Amino acid sequence: MDFVEVKNLIMKSGMELKVNGVFNANPERFSINVGHSTEEIAVHVDVRFSYLSDKRQLIINHKTGDAWQEEQRDARFPFTAGQAFQVSVVFNFDTFDIYLPDGQVAHFTNHLGAQEYKYIFFVGDATVKNISVNVADKPTKR
């Protein structure tokens, strides 16, 4: 599994992280993570093609004190092995809005409660082609 990290790229309320990539031909999983460190993750977007007992599942979670918390499972799975994808994460201070490739949106509470995050990392079976953090072009609660 590949691991890519970006440090000191500030993500504040009203900002959007756009991730463009291509999934491997036979992926198990790929995750997008925003937080303070690998032990303190505000939002963990985990695309599971076939991981443990999960098949075609979107899992959203957060990690506090190096312990995963209660996960949010989403039955939507607009991802295809071997294909390009774009996922956007919009930070709205109290929530994260995750824009999926098919235009649907998943919502997740900002459980850590911070006003900004400076650590973004990606893990798994995809090649990240481009990332950007900018003022959101989608509706936010700025």
Swiss-Prot record:
SMART domains: Gal-bind_lectin, GLECT. It is found in: Secreted. Glycans are attached at residue 130. Skin; highest expression in that of individuals showing resistance to infectious disease. Keywords: Glycoprotein, Hemagglutinin, Lectin, Secreted. It comes from the Eukaryota. One of its GO terms (biological process) is defense response to Gram-positive bacterium. Residues 3-134 form the Galectin domain. Gene3D superfamilies: 2.60.120.200. A beta-D-galactoside binds at residues 68-74. GO terms for molecular function: carbohydrate binding; laminin binding. One of its GO terms (cellular component) is extracellular space. The N-terminus is blocked. It holds the Pfam family Gal-bind_lectin. PANTHER family: GALECTIN, GALECTIN-1. Homodimer. Involved in host defense at the body surface. Causes agglutination of the Gram-positive bacterium S.difficile. Possesses calcium-independent hemagglutinating activity. Binds beta-galactoside inhibiting its haemagglutinating activity. This is Galactose-binding lectin l-1. It comes from Anguilla japonica.
